[in-house]
């Protein structure tokens, strides 16, 4: 029996020690999309000015087609606070003094026999949770798709290698063309269905993770 118990505990610890797949750079999901431009024929006229390479001074530089680049300004701040508590009290008291049997008191050694029972229970639980996060910065992303209503699906990532680890930012979401500023930037708070991930890999990132044994004690499998 003890052998099966040890085997079950080992399986539970193995399950608790499993971690999600580590992110890698150059993920195909975040790979940029390059627009397919038709080949242009440049006539050799001998002039410095070429019509095929000209750009209007009054054209809109904001992203509007697949393959364009847009800068997302990260301005994220969240704060959550929650508290809960409950208290349960229960008690009972019973006494039978003296005890009668056959019309007379029941006694032992001349001492009247009585019965007393008293029980009480008091359970009190309190919990508090307070969490706040903030993220500031910027990241340039690609326009991956233009929807029928003109909204843009944007996606991009940025990797930074620092000493013994890598830090990365990944962003994906949907933006409105009207919300893009003249300098081709948009606040992250204006993105719909936004997915913003800021994390890292390496020695420093691993040091912040909880060990597998601590995960077991904090999981639902811990009976206490």
Swiss-Prot record:
Keywords: Bacterial flagellum, Cell outer membrane, Lipoprotein, Membrane, Palmitate, Signal
Gene Ontology biological-process entries: bacterial-type flagellum-dependent cell motility
Residues with lipidation of kind N-palmitoyl cysteine: 16
Subcellular location: Cell outer membrane; Bacterial flagellum basal body
Chief localization: membrane
SS bond partners: none
Lipid-linked residues (S-diacylglycerol cysteine): 16
InterPro entries xref list: Flag_Lring
Signal sequence coordinates: 1-15
GO molecular function, one term: cytoskeletal motor activity
GO cellular component labels: bacterial-type flagellum basal body, distal rod, L ring; cell outer membrane
Membrane topology: Lipid-anchor
Pfam families registered for this protein in UniProt: FlgH
Function description: Assembles around the rod to form the L-ring and probably protects the motor/basal body from shearing forces during rotation.
Family in the record: Belongs to the FlgH family.
Subunit and interaction comment: The basal body constitutes a major portion of the flagellar organelle and consists of four rings (L,P,S, and M) mounted on a central rod.
UniProt-recorded name of the protein: Flagellar L-ring protein
The species this protein was found in: Shewanella sp. (strain MR-7)
């Amino acid at each position: 029996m003890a052998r099966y118990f040890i085997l079950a505990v080992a399986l539970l610890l193995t399950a608790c020690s499993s971690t999600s797949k580590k992110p890698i750079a150059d993920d195909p999901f975040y790979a940029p999309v390059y627009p397919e431009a038709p080949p242009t024929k440049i006539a050799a006229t001998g002039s410095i000015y070429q019509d095929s390479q000209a750009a209007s001074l009054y054209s809109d530089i904001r992203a509007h087609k697949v393959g364009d680049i847009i800068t997302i300004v990260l301005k994220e701040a969240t704060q959550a606070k929650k508290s809960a508590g409950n208290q349960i009290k229960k008690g009972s008291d019973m006494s039978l003094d003296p005890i009668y049997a056959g019309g007379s008191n029941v006694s032992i050694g001349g001492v009247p026999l009585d019965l007393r029972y008293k029980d009480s229970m008091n359970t009190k639980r309190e919990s508090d949770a307070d969490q706040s996060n903030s993220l500031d910065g910027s990241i340039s992303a690609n326009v991956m798709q233009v929807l029928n209503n003109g909204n843009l699906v944007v996606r991009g990532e940025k990797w930074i290698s620092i000493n013994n680890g890598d830090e990365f930012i990944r962003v994906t979401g949907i933006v409105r063309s009207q919300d893009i500023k003249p300098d081709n930037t948009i606040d992250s708070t204006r993105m719909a269905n936004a997915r913003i991930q800021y994390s890292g890999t390496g020695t420093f990132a691993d040091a912040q993770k909880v060990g597998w044994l601590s995960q077991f004690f904090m999981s639902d499998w811990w009976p206490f």
